């Protein structure tokens, strides 16, 4: 479950254990059904009651995907 997203990265919950410093190819669906494809580096992990909270940094996100995230944030923050 994605809790927050910005052009710099994403915060999310998962039951799966991921290692800090690891990289993943990701595909994220925004509310507008726009898809974001990016490499995500796990930079933070915090164990929680129902799994793990992760902070991930986007690596090499395209300008067009960054704009999609900016638009998502405008509507999400209303």
Regions found by a protein language model. Give the residues of each.
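Structured alpha-helical
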Residues: 1-78
């Amino acid at each position: 479950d994605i809790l927050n997203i910005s052009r710099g990265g994403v915060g999310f919950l998962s039951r799966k254990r991921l290692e800090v410093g690891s990289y993943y190819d990701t595909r994220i669906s925004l509310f507008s059904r726009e898809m974001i494809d990016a490499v995500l580096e796990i930079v933070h992990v915090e164990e929680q009651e129902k799994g793990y909270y992760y902070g991930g940094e986007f690596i090499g996100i395209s300008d067009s995907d960054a704009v999609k995230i900016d638009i998502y944030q405008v509507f999400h923050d209303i």
